[in-house]
Amino acid sequence: MEKRMSKTELTRHEIREKALQALFPLDFNADLTKQDAIDYALAYDNREIVSEDGEDLVPTYLDLLVGGVCSRKAELDEVITNHLGNNWSMQRLAKIDIVILRLAIFEMLYVSDVPNIVALNEAVELSKKYSDDRSRKFVNGVLSNVMKEIDSEA
């Protein structure tokens, strides 16, 4: 029995999950291109996104998230570092949690049509699925502090 690829549009939640799946291996494999990482993430659950004329299509928002996080990684890591407790460093964090934090902070800082609370809640949902309960609470705490700082500067 042949497995068929569904040809459907992704929700923003699903796009965030695909972005996480693309960004995570990019941290470990210097030879992996952004486009290859996105392609692998889209192929992970046998989904194929196609345009009306049948062309394979990468959702614009997925490209924005992956490209944005990649290009601003140092800046995003600085924001994370500035919001860690005294006894914490980036080296102590689980790699998946770092990627989740980068993704959410990128949305908070650079995606104007996503409310900060939505970025925070989506990150918590991703951490529930890909990390553990302690990480979920940690991600929520860090992002709550980032959100408060952003909101106070607005």
From Swiss-Prot:
Which Gene Ontology cellular component terms are annotated?
cytosol
Specify the domain of life of the species encoding this protein: Bacteria
What would you give as a GO molecular function for this chain, any one? RNA binding
Does Manganese appear among the keywords?
Answer: no
Q: Which GO terms describe its biological process?
A: DNA-templated transcription termination; transcription antitermination
Entry keyword set: RNA-binding, Transcription, Transcription antitermination, Transcription regulation
Q: Which residues form the signal peptide?
A: none
Family statement drawn from the similarity comment of this UniProt entry: Belongs to the NusB family.
Which NCBIfam families is this protein grouped with?
nusB, PRK00202.1-1
What's this chain's function? Involved in transcription antitermination. Required for transcription of ribosomal RNA (rRNA) genes. Binds specifically to the boxA antiterminator sequence of the ribosomal RNA (rrn) operons.
**HAMAP family named in the record:** NusB (MF_00073)
Entry protein name: Transcription antitermination protein NusB
Q: Which organism is it from?
A: Enterococcus faecalis (strain ATCC 700802 / V583)
Lineage of source species: Bacteria, Bacillati, Bacillota, Bacilli, Lactobacillales
Report which gene this protein is encoded by: nusB
